[in-house]
Amino acid sequence: MISSTTGQEMTSREMLGYYLNKSYADAAAAKERGELICWSSSIAPNEFCEAMGIHVIYPENHAAAVAAKGGALDLLEVAEKKGYSIDLCSYARINLAYMDVQNCVAENIPLPDFVIVCNNICNTLLKWYENICTTLHIPMILIDVPFNYEDEISERSLDYIADQFVNAIRQMEEITGKKFDYDKFDKAMEISRESVYWWTTAMGKASALPSPLNG
């Protein structure tokens, strides 16, 4: 991809910034058109939203962008004045404060019509997203992932999560008022599988000496 400012091929970092800003701009335009916006935790089945034509925003990423641009402190103070403890995750506090002020040093994002959260990352997420829903009076779709004590995943756990996926699709159909598009879902899954392959391949290069990756 060619940069509009330099006229040269974009670096991977520049492309990442371009597509991130584009996703926020596309979501804002969609909100103005009356389309649905979903706030999602970083590891949740966003392929469901893609199948339903729902625009997805990741509050954790947005909070990190705010902090990277030096805007965290102002929002953290807003959150603390609202009664959120300083012991809470700063991502959560930044996002919960942003809901009030709806303005920040990073790209502004539209408020959600519903949220989808998967609790396989941290315990904070569940209460964070419950607060979003309570404040905005919107529905929450929860994917509850059981803790895995062994290397192998049990059939019981797989069945449990699969049942929740079925319920999540049913909830999305109720929220959107339309049927789930399985053709679009298959296409989204195809892209996801390819992305996983290339991500795994890229991460595998870290074993080389010298390593092309740091951190």
Predicted regions and their residues:
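An N-terminal, globular interaction/scaffold subdomain
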Residues: 39-108, 113, 120-121, 128-129
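Low-complexity, flexible helical/coil segments
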Residues: 72-78, 92-97, 149-157, 174-181
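A structural signal for short, well-ordered beta-strand segments and their strand-loop junctions
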Residues: 38-40, 56-59, 115-117, 139-144, ...
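Acidic/His-rich segments in extracytoplasmic proteins that coordinate ligands and/or metal ions
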Residues: 96-170
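A charged, amphipathic alpha-helical module
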Residues: 1-36, 162-215
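Short glycine/serine/threonine/alanine-rich loop segments
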Residues: 54, 138, 178
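Residues at alpha-helix termini
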Residues: 51, 134-135, 174
